[in-house]
Amino acid sequence: VHWTAEEKQLITGLWGKVNVADCGAEALARLLIVYPWTQRFFASFGNLSSPTAILGNPMVRAHGKKVLTSFGDAVKNLDNIKNTFAQLSELHCDKLHVDPENFRLLGDILIIVLAAHFPKEFTPECQAAWQKLVRVVAHALARKYH
């Protein structure tokens, strides 16, 4: 994947403002609410029976932070995303059996969360760079499936 200097700047510039705990929790909660079938991968998280329960669930919050923290590894390693996510791809494919389509869904949700949190900064150019990034990350996570 080739990144232009502008794309790198748009991604890293916005990432520097992201509250990983809050945005991660919101992104995962939205995924579980908007696409309820994804809840089956989180059966150990306890009560996911309603949007209120999901939004207040500390395990959702903690895992959302973990997910977005690892997404930060992509931001730090834009030129080596495939290798950055090799182990996570293996885990999600071989052990957790997550449908790789869910990575794309979470990426789309992350775009919505970023747009909501940063309405001024999230210009169409910024969105284009981030869409490219979430697509590359989703592809890297799905790599073990191919």
Swiss-Prot record:
GO annotation, biological process: hydrogen peroxide catabolic process
Binding site for heme b: H63, H92
The keyword Transcription is annotated on this UniProt entry: no
Domain Globin: 2-146
GO molecular function, one term: oxygen binding
Keywords: Heme, Iron, Metal-binding, Oxygen transport, Transport
One GO cellular component term: haptoglobin-hemoglobin complex
Domain of life where this protein originates: Eukaryota
Expression sites by tissue: Red blood cells.
Keyword Membrane on entry: no
Pfam families named among the record's database cross-references: Globin
Subunit architecture: Heterotetramer of two alpha chains and two beta chains.
Function, in words: Involved in oxygen transport from the lung to the various peripheral tissues.
Family: Belongs to the globin family.
Protein name from the UniProt record: Hemoglobin subunit beta
Gene that encodes it: HBB
